[in-house]
Amino acid sequence: MKKIGILGTGVVGTTIGTKLIGLDYEVMIGSRTASNEKSLSWVDKNGSSASAGTFEEAADFGEIIFNCTRGDAALEIFKQAGLNKFDNKTVIDISNPLDFSKGMPPTLIPEYVNTNSLAEEIQKLLPEANVVKTLNIVNCRGRRS
């Protein structure tokens, strides 16, 4: 069974994690602390194929890593996890380079638009990983009839 590590405990990370468990993957969701309430609640709802840990533990665990963190924190989170943890792994980046510092609505982080992207910066930070940028404008809540 493939092991997936997810960085981020928000609605995007937990929704993707739940779907992957339904497809028979083992999933560890990572946050700053292993005792994060959101991640522990998610584990309780998803059974034995779900686990929670730190960013570092999720990066260690996963053969494939999903980055579901806020774009303004993504690079720092990869550093917290340990850059070498991503060597020879596929990193699926779903983050958006949004700045929430002035409240809602957020704005784009200027250095990651026009001539550069957050995914390119992640790839530079993780030269031994295969970074794939996708799903960043797909609503994770699904369609409603």
Language-model features, listed with the residues they occupy:
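NAD(P)+-binding Rossmann beta1-loop-alpha1 motif at the extreme N-terminus of oxidoreductases
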Residues: 1-48
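A short helix-to-beta-strand connector/capping loop
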Residues: 45-51, 127-130
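Fold-independent oxyanion-binding glycine-rich loops
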Residues: 9, 31-32, 69, 94-95, ...
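Short, well-ordered alpha-helix to beta-strand connector turns
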Residues: 24, 61-63, 129
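Rossmann-like NAD(P)-binding element
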Residues: 47-92, 96-104
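Rossmann-fold NAD(P)-binding glycine/threonine-rich loop
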Residues: 94-141
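Short amphipathic alpha-helical segments
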Residues: 17-19, 40-41, 77-81, 103-105, ...
